[in-house]
Swiss-Prot record:
GO terms for cellular component: cytoplasm. It comes from the Eukaryota. The lineage of its organism: Eukaryota, Metazoa, Chordata, Craniata, Vertebrata. Keywords: Calcium, Metal-binding, Muscle protein, Repeat. Belongs to the parvalbumin family. InterPro entries: EF-hand-dom_pair, EF_Hand_1_Ca_BS, EF_hand_dom, Parvalbumin. It comes from Xenopus laevis (African clawed frog). This is Parvalbumin beta.
Length: 109
């Protein structure tokens, strides 16, 4: 698991369990249940780097859609509505993607 040493398997499993149904994903709840919101800024940056699949320095909409699958290969993709809401919440500068600082603000408001 790519998040070993940052997040516990049990916390990740619990967070994923609570958003199995379509349109049930809430990023604030997920970050709290997975333990991410209580991690250091460096840990949050490390998680961002894992989520930034193409290493562009940003998490784009397509990467957000597959957000849950970064935590478990068997997790579902986010719905279009969930993806757009997640992007809108995190994209504070309106460029259509989430940078590392925006991600940190999203995780630790």
């Amino acid at each position: 698991m790519a998040f070993g040493g940052i997040l516990s398997e049990a916390d990740i499993s619990a967070a994923l369990q609570n958003c199995q149904a379509a349109d049930s994903f809430n990023f604030k709840t997920f970050f709290a249940q997975s333990g991410l919101s209580s991690k250091s800024a460096d840990d949050v940056k490390n998680v961002f780097a894992i989520l930034d699949q193409d290493r562009s320095g940003f998490i784009e909409e397509e990467e957000l859609k597959l957000f849950l699958q970064n935590f478990s290969a068997s997790a579902r993709a986010l719905t279009d509505a969930e993806t757009k809401a997640f992007l809108a919440a995190g994209d504070s500068d309106g460029d259509g993607k989430i940078g590392v600082e925006e991600f940190q603000s999203l995780v630790k408001p």
